[in-house]
Amino acid sequence: MSKLVWLDAGHGGKDSGAAANGIKEKDIVLKIVKKVKSILTSRYEVAVKLTRDSDVFYELIDRARKANAAKADLFVSVHINATPGGKGFETYRYVKTSASSSTGQQQKVLHDAIYKRIKKYGIKDRGEKAADLSVLRNTSMPAVLTENLFIDNKDEAALLKKDSFLNDVAEGHAEGIAEILNLKKKSGGSAPKKEDKPSSGKTKMVIVKDNPDGFLWVYNKADWNARYKKVKPDEAFTIDKTVTVNGSKMYKLKSGLYITAASKYVTVKEK
């Protein structure tokens, strides 16, 4: 059964969102989500639904309810920023989810994929953030909100007026979503490899790094929801192999447990 992606173009109708330099947020984000949908449905085995595909208004709670009712696998809300003196790109997850959570790791995948596409324009990376935003709080699936430049910054508004730039923004969104959901490509394409054996004959150890939470979860199966126990910084475990789960890598340990393979949280050394 195909995965379902819910794309939410911010604002719409009576709510223009941010507006400056002759453009409105509601119009730009609608262009972006339509491009993302086109890329995803043309390249991957996936279903994509939009909160809106025209200039109409939906309350914030209704956006989340529609996605929840459809049982979407991933919710991505697309916005343009505005604040005096602001510039750059950032993403948000719900404030009560940590960077090391499943949602946090999926946020990182999406964030990195988008920034990889737009950094050639000299865009500032403002980082992965967390906030108590309605569409993130009320959705029942992993949800990420992207803020794609500042409409009130003259230079960034000039980019937002260029279709070529919006194409890159859309490509980044699509590539990140495809990686998160491990989407299978159409026309002979194949899904990413599920497992990779360690490259050398030496024993590899994964060591937990310091992080703001002061711990990491280990899991009793290859599932980000299968939390088993917390482990502390400097604890080390023997790696059996690497697996990909919903677009993010895990190490399967010799003990049979699993831990994130994200270099932000762990380091690997040969023994």
UniProtKB/Swiss-Prot annotation:
Gene3D superfamilies: Zn-dependent exopeptidases
Protein name per UniProt: Endolysin
Molecular functions (GO terms): N-acetylmuramoyl-L-alanine amidase activity
EC identifiers of the protein: 3.5.1.-
Function: Endolysin that degrades host peptidoglycans and participates with the holin protein(s) in the sequential events which lead to the programmed host cell lysis releasing the mature viral particles. Once the holin(s) has permeabilized the host cell membrane, the endolysin can reach the periplasm and break down the peptidoglycan layer.
GO CC, alphabetical: host cell cytoplasm; viral procapsid
Record localization: Host cytoplasm
Broad EC category: hydrolase
Superkingdom per UniProt: Viruses
GO biological process: defense response to bacterium; killing of cells of another organism; peptidoglycan catabolic process
Record key words, sorted: Antimicrobial, Bacteriolytic enzyme, Cytolysis, Host cell lysis by virus, Host cytoplasm, Hydrolase, Viral release from host cell
PANTHER family: N-ACETYLMURAMOYL-L-ALANINE AMIDASE, N-ACETYLMURAMOYL-L-ALANINE AMIDASE AMIC
Organism: Bacillus phage SPP1 (Bacteriophage SPP1)
Positions of the MurNAc-LAA domain: 5-178
Top-level taxonomy: Viruses, Duplodnaviria, Heunggongvirae, Uroviricota, Caudoviricetes
